[in-house]
């Protein structure tokens, strides 16, 4: 499970989704 996936379950954190998506992309690219 990705950090972004966990945050998507919490609507109050919507603004962080783009940031966490970027982090997930960076981590998956390592």
Swiss-Prot record:
Cysteines joined through disulfide linkages: none
TM region positions: none
Modified residues (Leucine amide): 30
GO aspect biological process, one term: defense response
Main subcellular localisation: secreted
Protein name: Rothein 3.4
Function: Lacks antimicrobial activity. Does not inhibit the formation of NO by neuronal nitric oxide.
């Amino acid at each position: 499970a990705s950090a972004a996936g966990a945050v998507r379950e919490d609507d109050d954190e919507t603004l962080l989704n783009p940031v966490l998506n970027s982090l997930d992309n960076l981590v998956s690219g390592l």
